[in-house]
Amino acid sequence: MISCGGKRILRRNDGEEGSLPVSDELEVLQSVTARLEGANIPYMVTGSMAANFYAVPRMTRDIDLVIELSDRDVDRVTRLFQVEYYIDRDMVQRAVRDHAMFNMIHNAMVVKVDCVVRKETEYRREEFARRRAVSVAGQRIFIVSPEDLILSKLDWAKESRSQMQLDDVRNLLRSVQRLDTEYLNRWADRLGLIELYQEVCQ
């Protein structure tokens, strides 16, 4: 079993306190997640914004979310954001149908929010179940676990060999002090990411 980037831990630490740089992106993130919470729409923050929570921040202009949506949520989500955001109902509907991505843009701040409709695979269900409730600027926000963020970034880097994604993984491995290495090894192997995981651990 590969072990790198911290001690093994077998449970989550919900309610974790953290911070993100004050920015338009943070303001939009708080606005979007508060609306989703108010509408009882399950979500989690992922991508660069999540990496900035767990590790040394880098500049990002986009916000990435995974959302649980069904056909009956299409109109509700569109109405929820259509006043302050550019959002296309047809794009939302296609994303729900195909378990794909739609995006919306804050009209005033021009911050883009990419929303991926959660896929119905075993891993994506487990990843979503492991999301963490954290406090950012006094607001509860659900965020991907650091282990699943590492796996996602390895997956994104697998085909593209993106150095930025691999650097993000190394940053996370250095910064997060308690990682479930058993979980990381198991899913890296099952997802065909074990060689890339070994590479970043060297």
Question: Where are the regions that the model predicts?
Answer:
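Compositionally biased terminal segments of proteins
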Residues: 2-202
